[in-house]
Amino acid sequence: LYESERQQVLLGDDIDFMTDYMKLEKLCNPEFNFEVNILNEVRYIQVPPLLFMPVIEYVIRTTVCGENGKGENIRIDFQMEENQLRFICTYCLRKKESLQVAPAFDKLRQRLDLLYPGGYQLKSGYNDEALCTIGLMLEL
């Protein structure tokens, strides 16, 4: 949290913070499961602090367990391709009606507009099984 006062932090530090946050959630809800995948070497990329936390917080509030209460609730992928950082979060919705733009996403879009004017894409969607994906692509 001390690093949130800085303009930029290492993505690896932010990933560690998100992982700790989800581990804390798992202590409160033992059926909650998550997976974080880091493709390519993204840990040393500089990003604004806590940039991805609004997505994580929203997803934790809206997920359900896999079949029979077991399985992965959230999967997070970080990948660098050329000069584009990709953050993809996949999770199950409680119900399809839950897929609404959260107020936190409005604030996230405002922040992204200031930090990456015209240099980002924030998308979300779901399939028939209520599996939802939120993707954030940043031009670095």
Label for each model-derived stretch:
Residues 1-123, 132:
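Two-component histidine phosphotransfer core
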Residues 91, 135-140:
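C-terminal beta-strand of the catalytic ATP-binding
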Residues 126-128:
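A short beta-turn/loop motif at secondary-structure boundaries
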